[in-house]
UniProtKB/Swiss-Prot annotation:
Subunit structure: Homodimer.
CDD domains, per the entry: flavodiiron_proteins_MBL-fold (cd07709)
Positions of the Flavodoxin-like domain: 276-415
Family the UniProt entry places it in: In the N-terminal section; belongs to the zinc metallo-hydrolase group 3 family.
Protein name: Type A flavoprotein fprA
One Pfam family of this chain: ODP
Cofactor note text: Binds 1 FMN per monomer. Binds 2 iron ions per subunit.
Cofactors that this protein relies on: FMN; Fe cation
Residues where Fe cation 2 binds: D102, D186, H243
UniProt-listed Gene3D superfamilies: 3.40.50.360, Ribonuclease Z/Hydroxyacylglutathione hydrolase-like (3.60.15.10)
Lineage, broadest ranks: Bacteria, Pseudomonadati, Pseudomonadota, Alphaproteobacteria, Rhodobacterales
Keywords attached to this entry: Electron transport, Flavoprotein, FMN, Iron, Metal-binding, Oxidoreductase, Transport
GO-annotated molecular function: electron transfer activity; FMN binding; metal ion binding; oxidoreductase activity
């Protein structure tokens, strides 16, 4: 009997997983690996419940397809399970939905054992695979595929959907219509290791599912929304991700739940009122005075909502939702020992977890001797793909009345850029470096 998503079953996951392959659908087997001891993934998120590296073998009347592999340390588990369902000379197709190392760790050895196999992946994944295989790349039948292309296994066909930036540029999905299985790689995944493998058997993994989405997919939510539109017409009965439980019970509910996770963020982006957030750290109140002046100038625009935040002694994480929903941010920092202050760098580091591409960015601050902080912050904002329409504003020591007026004018110009009243302009690296 099927159950809704996240129905609470025994709280503790089972870490003693299957020793062999596991049937997912007729002719489809899980041949992945369990990693219950993992506690930190890609540096950016904690994994209290470990993770799984899900790989799949699909048997057709004319050969076998292998869809994704596992992290290199678990290649032995992968090959043992694969050998239980297929001979290497039967492997006709290797599909790489994503080239991150936790999905391609066994690829070089798999190709050595099955050199006759076709390798199919997205065109954007080709340079990554070339880097992985080095000189061996030319030895194999490797081609990029896009939406609408497919490879036949006889009575089963693997069809491909290009799904870029979910969450790397190379990501794609693979559709097995005969068994209604959609292989989504990282999409719909979760770092949750339970040897029972299926969502209707494992413990309650709601937190892991939502936390994974927040830390991995959230910066790419607009791309995820497009992919949901692309795959929604498919009559899938199973979603087979590359991490976490296989979603065989009510799989479409996970698509709906993912839409809910992103709907509020996308709705915030469509509002007519623009938002500007100003964050600052100040040693002797000089940068604080400049921040207030910028705030006052920007707030003169009736179409811009401006908020001012002193970061001293506060936590960065609570601001991330606000920043993601905002249209622009301005960061203020004094220059201390030739650099921006640590709190500002911590905020800049945290911004990699959210979508910042295309947002307005600006920097300002006071200094005593060298004044590099503003330039360094601007460079990082550009690295985050934000647009900088105005050169950063710096004042030496405490701002004068004239410099405070310059700050208000700076704020007015930022507001004009947000509302489209100013001519589009973007500061480039050469202009930053020259200051």
């Amino acid at each position: 009997m099927s159950v809704p998503p996240f129905t609470i079953r025994p709280a503790a996951p089972r870490l003693d997983g299957p020793t062999g392959p596991v049937a997912v659908a007729p002719g489809v087997h899980w041949v992945g690996a369990l990693d219950p001891g993992l506690r930190n993934f890609d540096v950016i998120l904690k994994t209290a419940n470990g993770t799984t590296y899900n790989a799949y073998a699909v048997r057709g009347s004319e050969g076998v397809a292998v869809i994704d592999t596992v992290k290199a340390e678990f290649a032995g588990d992968f090959f043992a399970r694969l050998e239980a369902v297929a001979r290497y000379d039967e492997i006709r197709l290797i599909v790489l939905n994503h080239l991150e190392p936790d999905h391609t760790g066994a690829v070089p050895e798999l190709l050595r054992r099955a050199p006759q196999a076709q390798v199919r992946l997205s065109p954007r994944g080709l340079p990554m695979l070339r880097a992985l295989l080095k000189d061996d790349f030319e030895r194999y039948d490797i081609k990029g595929v896009t939406t609408g292309q497919s490879v036949s296994l006889g009575d089963r066909i693997c069809s491909f959907f290009t799904t870029p930036f979910v969450h790397w540029p190379d990501t794609q999905c693979t559709w097995l219509a005969a068994e209604r299985v959609l292989f989504t790689c990282d999409l719909f995944g979760s770092h949750y290791c339970d040897g029972r493998l299926f969502n209707d058997l494992v413990g309650d993994f709601r937190f892991s599912f939502e936390y994974y989405f927040d830390r991995i997919m959230r910066p790419f939510r607009s791309f995820v929304a497009q992919v949901l539109d692309l795959i929604e017409p498919l009559d899938f009965g199973i979603i087979a991700p590359a991490h976490g439980p296989i979603l065989r019970s009510h799989p479409r509910d996970y698509l709906t739940h993912t839409r809910r996770l992103i709907s509020s963020w996308l709705a915030a982006e469509t509002g007519s009122e623009k938002t500007l957030l100003i964050f600052y750290v100040s040693a002797y109140r000089a940068t604080a005075q400049l921040a207030q002046a910028i705030h006052d100038g920007a707030a003169e625009s009736p179409d811009v909502r401006v908020s001012l935040f002193d970061l001293e002694g506060g936590e960065i994480t609570p601001f991330l939702d606000l920043i993601e929903e905002a249209d622009g941010i301005a960061l203020g920092t004094p220059t201390i020992n030739g650099d921006a202050v640590r709190t500002i760098w911590e905020m800049l580091a945290a911004l990699v977890d959210i979508e910042t591409r295309g947002k307005l960015g600006a920097a300002f601050g006071s200094y005593g001797w060298s004044g590099e902080a503003v330039r360094l912050v601007e460079t990082r904002l550009q690295g985050l793909k934000m647009r900088l329409p105005e050169p950063g504003l710096r004042v030496k020591l405490h701002p004068s009345a004239a410099e405070l007026e310059e700050g208000r004018a700076f704020g007015r110009r930022l507001a004009d850029h947000l509302t489209g009243r100013a001519r589009p302009r973007e500061v480039d690296f050469a202009e930053i470096a020259a200051r």
